[in-house]
Amino acid sequence: MIKLLKKMGKREVLMAVLCTILVLGQVYFDLTLPDYMTDLTMMLNTAGSETSDILNVGLKMLGCTLASAALAIGCGYLSAKTASGFSYTIREKLFNHVMDMGSEEMQDFSIPSLITRTTNDITQIQMIISMGLQMIIKSPIMAVWAVIKILGKSWQLSAVTAAFVVVICVFVLAVMATCIPRFRIVQKLTDKINRVARENLTGINVVHAFNAEKYQNDKFDVPSKDMMNTQLKNQRMFALMMPVMNIGMNGLTLAIYWLGAVLIQQVALTAVQDRITLFSNVVVFSTYATYVVMSFMMLVMIFMMLPAAQVSAERINEVLERDVNIKEGSVSEGREQGTVEFKNVSFRYPHASEDELSNISFKINKGQTLAIIGATGSGKTTLISLIPRFYDATEGEVLVDGVNVKNYKFDTLYDKLGYVTQKAVLFAGSIRENVFFGESAAPETDEELKNAIELSQAEEFVDKLPDGTEHMISQMGRNVSGGQKQRLSIARALSRKPEILVFDDSFSALDYKTDAKLREGLNEKLGDTTKIIVAQRISTIRHADKIIVLDRGEAVGMGTHEELMKNCDVYKEIALSQLSAAELA
């Protein structure tokens, strides 16, 4: 928790200091009230006291009350500002750090867990700071100040109060020791519930199609019940705290008055003034003792929240302190243009026992088309994911424009690439916003938008929309078909006017006619652009300048369609499974 608080900005620190000053003032006025109460008690029990003097003391007490209330309001405002400002800063840092993470780090944490840490965990921190600035600071100051005030009044009464404080401290520590491990369990269960819910909602159509509602409900019910039972155990412990505190506070008040009565009885009946003074001290002592108890009650409220906040802080720090394996280089310019080269590249996924890719070497030049084909799981997507550095090669070098991709600045490398993912991803917003997504050196004009949509073969359905390119796309593109999503994803890559286009099985959702028109348009209008196409269809790749055939992570064939039909059995088998010998001739 302290490690996280060290990230607080100067503005938040200043507001926290001001809040502390206001708390000091508030405590001063609160603890001044019993002194006036002593004077008032003495006046009421002393013959000949003037009404004006009594009213004067009463007005001073009213002034202290109003001043304390005003300072409390100011402290509440500042604590809320501090907490919200700090949570905003941490949320920004956390989100930006997550955005810098590579695929490896994302897999280690999981998306539902990262969402929980960015939302729920930060809310826990915000609550503890807001409450803490008002209570954690106020409680010990008030308790210590009140103890100092009562120390010289009666050692017997002080001993009773001290005994109560010790008992409460032991009780609170026991509750915290029991509850903190359970809060960690609750946070992990929250991640699990988010994961199951996200999986269920994302695949809701599949769930309905396979009549799997009961199975999914049972799957969700297990972590949900575990969370309920764990939280109930904690709530039972917390339910004991306030009654115990109330019983203790009332018992302490009763003990003070009983002991005070005993002490008063021991004073001689003739010493009336001494009895009045002692009675006044008992009343004031009871008030101060109540302040001590109230301080501990406030601390108890914080301690009820603190374990969850502590776990949340650990989870946030875990993400912020996670090193990103993909480090940015310093090169901002390539030696060539439009070239991609793999030199003896091997790759192994983290924690895997075998290589996913083994000793891959090839080079394509500006304007050429490279196709990659192979069975499912042969490593096609893995191979092209090394170009934009979703992962880094375990061995060998991946070069773009003659420079190792590890040496490039991220902006420089990404500006050279137009990447179309295997699974089309669209974002909530208009078609125009999706096509011109991200930062690019390419102009964002209506003409460029039209060209990208035409070339991607998306014009057919975009022109039919009432709002055209201003038509709003829902989250993840749920209001357009798979083929439409794929074409808009391709338009997004084309709008960047990159040197190198990478298509990761991006034509799979297109019909054969649209596929052919798209490839024809790419060859005609983007003759100088290097194209890398991962595909399953022979018809999509047969006219490529170079085709790589992958099998279990190894390049078992490389050449043109005609060359591979002659000397690569794997390619020939794939080709004949899709087209007849006459069609392949």
Name each region found by the language model:
Residues R11, M15-Y28, T32, S130-V186, ...:
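Transmembrane helices of ABC transporter permease
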